[in-house]
């Protein structure tokens, strides 16, 4: 693994027309309370509304998978072969929306597939909310996340990181934060 994360502002995503089109599609999704590991113990750890794009054949899925594949080849070298459905997340001030420290993979499951890469696409302008900061726990890897904090939370920013990296979204104290996540999967880590 050459890097701990990949961070970019994809030109097509930073175009407001493209982002507004994605947000419009997200607004048609049915939202439900986000869970932690398919269990209803989320109030302490997670407070967000989520919806899923059930059709994996949408252009956004292909675009994000293509980006992840390229980033994986250049930086991580994981065995990846598919995606899970794109997840749309909403963190609201009225809920103190957050997702406390967690990882996106489960090393203890009995499945033959595992989340390998996590992708977050920021849909909100940082002026539209306070708090709600995406933070990666990368200090043990010799990286100061503070150097990347502001950039990672810009509208249109896209970050790809190994699903085993601890991360969180801090509580939203004003406004609403919107983002998309996609998980790239592959055979279990050996």
Question: For each predicted feature, which ranges?
Answer:
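Non-heme Fe(II)/2-oxoglutarate
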Residues: 1-87, 96-98
């Amino acid at each position: 693994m050459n890097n701990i994360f990949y961070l970019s502002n994809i030109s097509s995503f930073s175009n407001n027309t493209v982002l507004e089109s994605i947000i419009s599609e997200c607004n048609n999704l049915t939202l439900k309370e986000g869970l932690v590991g398919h269990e209803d113990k989320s109030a302490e750890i997670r407070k967000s509304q989520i919806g899923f794009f059930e059709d994996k054949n949408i252009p956004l899925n292909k675009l994000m998978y293509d980006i992840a594949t390229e980033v994986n080849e250049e930086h991580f070298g994981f065995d990846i072969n598919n995606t899970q459905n794109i997840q749309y997340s909403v963190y609201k001030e009225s809920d103190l929306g957050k997702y406390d420290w967690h990882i996106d993979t489960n090393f203890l499951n009995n499945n033959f597939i595992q989340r390998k890469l996590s992708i977050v696409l920021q849909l909100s302008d940082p002026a539209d909310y306070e708090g709600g900061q995406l933070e990666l726990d990368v200090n043990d890897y010799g990286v100061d996340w503070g150097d990347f904090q502001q950039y990672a939370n810009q509208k249109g920013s896209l970050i790809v990181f190994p699903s085993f990296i601890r991360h969180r979204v801090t509580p939203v104290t004003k406004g609403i934060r919107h983002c998309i996540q996609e998980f790239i999967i592959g055979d279990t880590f050996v």
